[in-house]
Amino acid sequence: MISILFVAGGTGGHVIPALNMADYIAQKAPHWKISFVGRKDSFEEGLIRGKYDFYGLNISRSSDVKKLSYYLSISDAIKILNEVKPDILVVFGSYITVPVIIASIVKKYPFFLHEQNVVPGRVTKLFYEFSEGVAISFPETREYFRDKSKVYLTGNFVKTELLTMDKASCKKELGFDENRKLLLITGGSQGAMKINYEVKKIIPYLLDKGWQILHQIGEKNYVRYIEEIPIEEWIQKGYNPVPFIRNMELAICGADFAISRAGATTISQFLIAGLPAIYIPYPYAKDNHQKYNAELVVKVGGGELLLEDQLSSQKLLHLLDKWNDEKRLAEASEACKKISIATGRENFWNLLLEKLEGRN
């Protein structure tokens, strides 16, 4: 029986692709043992525990290599490896993964890295030469690695079943009019106060222009936001504000245009679905990786880049008027699809089999 250990945590951008890949492997090889390492008492533990074996590490972003707790995390990681005895690890670079990578190198356990962003993160660049290889989501990422023999273009690990459904059917299932354009607004799973604040000023105008709107507010800000708007009037015109979109793939499938952050998984989903967007990168993302993700899409005509320090309701209104055009939307949708990779999980599965067979 093959044992595979996923290492992911810190953000949904790392955890969701890991879960997507684990689910794919569980379908392809139900006899394989799948386990996860993440942070103890974290959101990823809540997502994963009960579905797959989960091992928690006591580590935070503020952990320092000079502190004893950091070395204890490496020691704990070694204990986990001794218990799980994985045939291979799949690592999604973030601070949580470093003790496990070091433990894997010390104990000589092979590992793959997966890079979701266009510009690879520090963990990926630091450790890829010790790995079996790094699977990348975009061809442009290859240029950031000196040893290109270890770099494999797979695509991101995205569930594509809903993303490629008929748009009208998705709108209908979401409760919207299938004959009207749908605007998706999301500041990520936690929402984004600045985006919400500027969007709120132009909702009446957008509704009058014929847009329907699905707006993910964020659970933390939802009650206050709802109290500040004429909710009943806007809902009647086609506005649906929600704390959290439970089925984001369905929402992406049904949308004609979006206002969004530029996380790697979000962008991969948008490209596969052919969804153009105004991208407002999260300004505090490490190494500004969301900006580089967005620039790749904008370069091919798949949307617009709007930095948060330049964000205003007037600029949003100008851009949305520009994109309220059937021909422009159709051309941008095709441009997105042309650079998408919808077979990321299948590609990595084949790579994994090849490497495992080569070791036997």
UniProtKB/Swiss-Prot annotation:
Intrachain S-S bonds: none
Major subcellular location class: membrane
GO terms assigned for molecular function: UDP-N-acetyl-D-glucosamine:N-acetylmuramoyl-L-alanyl-D-glutamyl-meso-2,6-diaminopimelyl-D-alanyl-D-alanine-diphosphoundecaprenol 4-beta-N-acetylglucosaminlytransferase activity; undecaprenyldiphospho-muramoylpentapeptide beta-N-acetylglucosaminyltransferase activity
Pathway: Cell wall biogenesis; peptidoglycan biosynthesis
Compartment list: Cell inner membrane
Top EC class for this record: transferase
GO CC annotation terms, alphabetical: plasma membrane
Keyword Cell membrane: yes
Membrane topology term: Peripheral membrane protein
Binding residues for UDP-N-acetyl-alpha-D-glucosamine: T11, G12, G13, N117, S189, I245, Q290
Keywords: Cell cycle, Cell division, Cell inner membrane, Cell membrane, Cell shape, Cell wall biogenesis/degradation, Glycosyltransferase, Membrane, Peptidoglycan synthesis, Transferase
Pfam family, one: Glyco_tran_28_C
UniProt xrefs under InterPro entries: GlcNAc_MurG, Glyco_trans_28_C, GlycoTrans_28_N
Catalytic activity from the UniProt record: di-trans,octa-cis-undecaprenyl diphospho-N-acetyl-alpha-D-muramoyl-L-alanyl-D-glutamyl-meso-2,6-diaminopimeloyl-D-alanyl-D-alanine + UDP-N-acetyl-alpha-D-glucosamine = di-trans,octa-cis-undecaprenyl diphospho-[N-acetyl-alpha-D-glucosaminyl-(1->4)]-N-acetyl-alpha-D-muramoyl-L-alanyl-D-glutamyl-meso-2,6-diaminopimeloyl-D-alanyl-D-alanine + UDP + H(+)
PANTHER family, per database record: GLYCOSYLTRANSFERASE (PTHR21015:SF22), UDP-N-ACETYLGLUCOSAMINE--N-ACETYLMURAMYL-(PENTAPEPTIDE) PYROPHOSPHORYL-UNDECAPRENOL N-ACETYLGLUCOSAMINE TRANSFERASE 1 (PTHR21015)
Stated role: Cell wall formation. Catalyzes the transfer of a GlcNAc subunit on undecaprenyl-pyrophosphoryl-MurNAc-pentapeptide (lipid intermediate I) to form undecaprenyl-pyrophosphoryl-MurNAc-(pentapeptide)GlcNAc (lipid intermediate II).
Entry similarity comment: Belongs to the glycosyltransferase 28 family. MurG subfamily.
Full protein name: UDP-N-acetylglucosamine--N-acetylmuramyl-(pentapeptide) pyrophosphoryl-undecaprenol N-acetylglucosamine transferase
Organism field: Dictyoglomus thermophilum (strain ATCC 35947 / DSM 3960 / H-6-12)
